């Protein structure tokens, strides 16, 4: 009988483009999502959880052009790959599932309920999304999105509300006023400016695309570089040539004037935009919407120190149909090359009035925002407000195996007082290993009670944080005056542990 071939052991590794999150990283994200969710909830938005898997047909953007979805999504076929099996895919954003839900339950009762979705429908959602794209530094195939959208509200009051809510979210997670700004623009205004500049009509679609990409590079290339891209084109430092939009110098002036129309306050900016869109109905409509948004925000106390009309915001204008907004953090950080740069964008959104049209054939107005959770966490780390460290539990050490019930009673007392605590459950034979474990867990306090201490009704409290500091740089006199280990009565255990934890916060 042939000897059965031994199967190789699986390799323990994370798939390419994915990563694991431990301890403090998970706690920090959970805390941030909770704070943002509280703001969304306060504004009257309801939470929604959808399946991680959608039909490729519902995703829309990745419909197969041959016999399977394109490579941008993680997709698989039902029924073992049979020809009539539906293609399914992991969601690539939170908007596609919202479109499906809004269409599916527009008139149909919600599961287990009698009513269908209200209109307008206000929802927020948080969770991972997946994109089958080439990974890179800081770019993963799974990441978190945190969205809020209003479906069925045509008024720009819904857009103004999203902007106000976005500002409140940033402050709720610890971004101070003055360190951020929410910038607002409108696709209709840009359409109007392009119309005035002779770029209307289907035959100018390619040129409009070049204009959009050009003005998005304003920060990097400056007005001169953008002007080149609006004209014949531009040669970069490497000698590569980028073809331009081919518009006249006079019309390029109009585009640049639009991008640079931001003035000292929102009213002055609106005035500049009115003159630039004169003669264009769509442009005039867009300026009027921006004026309404600024007025609605001012009535709620959101001035230009927090939210401004800024025509230089063009990212996403190719997708949105009306107002578009972007939250930018304005403080400086060091980039990977050691250069001082502004932190930049952490959230964006806008109005998209064709959300459920693919499903119903009818236009349904919608507006929303998506907050980049990982970017926002990185910003808080950059400002020192998050340290990437999570305080570990208090460790009750085990001096006598036969007294485990007493140690468990002790840890229960701590937990009942709201203190995170655990009993050491490894091999207690080597006490030094218990303290090493406590250090590795970043524990603030180790509790020690042998039979002698138990007989006297006391415990030893070892302040591990103070002990580490003293071991690092304390003089002999400081070490003697600040003992890292003290003896306290069992009756005072909770109060003394709370005092040590509070001292190191």
From Swiss-Prot:
UniProt record, GO biological process: histidyl-tRNA aminoacylation
Gene Ontology CC entries for this record: cytoplasm
Pfam families associated with the record: HGTP_anticodon, tRNA-synt_His
Catalytic activity: tRNA(His) + L-histidine + ATP = L-histidyl-tRNA(His) + AMP + diphosphate + H(+)
Protein localization: Cytoplasm
S-adenosyl-L-methionine in keyword set: no
Keywords: Aminoacyl-tRNA synthetase, ATP-binding, Cytoplasm, Ligase, Nucleotide-binding, Protein biosynthesis
The protein's Enzyme Commission number: 6.1.1.21
Keyword Nucleotide-binding: yes
Molecular-function GO terms, alphabetical: ATP binding; histidine-tRNA ligase activity
Family stated for the protein in its record: Belongs to the class-II aminoacyl-tRNA synthetase family.
NCBIfam families cross-referenced by the UniProt entry: hisS (TIGR00442)
Subunit structure and binding partners: Homodimer.
Protein name, per record: Histidine--tRNA ligase
Organism field: Jannaschia sp. (strain CCS1)
Lineage: Bacteria, Pseudomonadati, Pseudomonadota, Alphaproteobacteria, Rhodobacterales
Gene: hisS
């Amino acid at each position: 009988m042939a000897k059965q071939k031994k199967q190789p052991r699986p390799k323990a590794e994370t798939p390419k483009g994915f990563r694991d999150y431990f301890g403090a990283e998970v706690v920090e994200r959970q805390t941030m999502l909770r704070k943002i969710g509280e703001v969304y909830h306060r504004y009257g938005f309801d939470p929604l959880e959808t399946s991680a898997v959608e039909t490729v047909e519902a995703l829309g953007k990745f419909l197969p052009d041959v016999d399977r979805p394109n490579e941008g999504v993680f997709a698989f076929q039902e029924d073992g790959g049979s020809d009539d099996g539906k293609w399914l895919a992991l969601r690539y954003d939170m908007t596609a599932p919202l479109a499906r839900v809004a269409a599916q339950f527009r008139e149909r009762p919600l599961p287990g309920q009698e009513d269908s979705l209200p209109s307008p429908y206000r929802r927020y959602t948080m969770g991972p999304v997946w994109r089958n794209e080439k990974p890179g530094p800081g770019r993963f195939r799974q990441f978190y999105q945190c969205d809020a959208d209003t479906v069925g509200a045509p008024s720009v009051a819904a857009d103004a509300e999203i902007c106000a809510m976005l500002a409140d979210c940033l402050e709720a997670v610890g971004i101070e006023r003055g360190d951020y700004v929410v910038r607002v623009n409108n696709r209709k205004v840009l359409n109007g400016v392009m119309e005035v500049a002779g770029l209307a009509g289907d035959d100018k679609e390619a040129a409009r695309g070049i204009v959009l990409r050009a003005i998005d590079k304003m920060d990097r290339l400056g007005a001169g570089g953008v002007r080149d891209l609006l004209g014949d084109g531009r040669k970069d430092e490497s000698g590569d040539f980028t073809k331009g939009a081919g518009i006249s110098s006079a019309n390029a002036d109009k585009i640049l004037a639009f991008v640079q129309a931001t003035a000292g306050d929102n009213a002055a900016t609106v005035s500049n935009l009115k003159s630039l869109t004169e003669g264009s109905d769509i442009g005039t409509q867009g300026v009027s919407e921006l004026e309404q948004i600024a007025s609605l925000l001012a009535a709620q106390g959101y001035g230009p120190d927090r939210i401004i009309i800024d025509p230089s915001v063009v990212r996403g204008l190719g997708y949105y149909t009306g107002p578009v907004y972007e939250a930018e953090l304005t403080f400086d950080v060091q980039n990977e090359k050691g250069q001082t740069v502004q932190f930049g964008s952490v959230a964006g959104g806008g109005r998209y009035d064709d959300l459920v049209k693919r499903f119903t054939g009818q236009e349904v107005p919608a507006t929303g925002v998506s907050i980049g959770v990982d970017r926002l966490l990185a910003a808080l780390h950059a400002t020192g407000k998050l340290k990437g460290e999570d305080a570990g539990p208090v460790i009750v050490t085990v001096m006598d195996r036969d007294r485990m019930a007493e140690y468990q009673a002790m840890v229960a007392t701590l937990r009942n007082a709201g203190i995170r605590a655990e009993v050491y459950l490894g091999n207690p034979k080597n006490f030094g290993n218990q303290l090493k474990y406590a250090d590795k867990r970043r524990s603030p306090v180790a509790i020690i009670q042998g039979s002698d201490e138990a007989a006297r009704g006391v415990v030893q409290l070892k302040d591990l944080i103070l002990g580490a500091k003293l071991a690092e740089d304390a003089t002999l006199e400081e070490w003697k005056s600040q003992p890292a280990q003290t003896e306290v009565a069992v009756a005072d255990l909770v109060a003394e542990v709370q005092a040590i934890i509070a001292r190191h916060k």
